[in-house]
């Protein structure tokens, strides 16, 4: 049930992989897609920290053999806790063990919890291990803390809790060419509409091994209203149109704003680029 793939999830994955290897079994990470919140509250703001592809890459790198995706639809939402364990986990998937957090609930109406999973699982040969929260000096490590940090533009905290920089991905598409006209051609990403949007502003980061000065926001200098992600890759030449670009966000340099003139804008972009190189 690993949506954010952060330090707590990595701790769970490490334990699962260790148990699986000791038992000579494959280690599988599991996740629901879409997030159950999306099913029960479809109008809630999007908050996904990782895409399915990102999760798969991260857990494979950690040593998992595969990722299991439960499609959270009406059928799964109406599956009783007993059927989830017996019919799905044991009979259909043949699992011999599961590891969850102590706050894990499942089944129709959240009818199952870790006690139900442990007792009913044991009766059907499924060993359930429950792990407590992972904490640091700021409290329990959770996806909510990471979201709050990103919404505040606090990349350092997000990076520490994720154990990696927060990443946005998107296909490079044609934009207004304003950056090119100013001498700073940008890769304009079509962002995942379901992903969390960090605080608008100018960021330092990296893409394709190049330092990046990136703008996330609505481009107020040009009177924009739609969210954009524009990345200037330092010392890069080439055509990225149609490519999928992965952009790491290292630091929020400043808020986005409009300028009195194009000259002022160019001067600020140059300063942002210099800061991104530091």
For each predicted feature, which ranges?
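Phosphate/ribose-recognition catalytic cores of enzymes acting on nucleotide-derived substrates
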Residues: 175-278
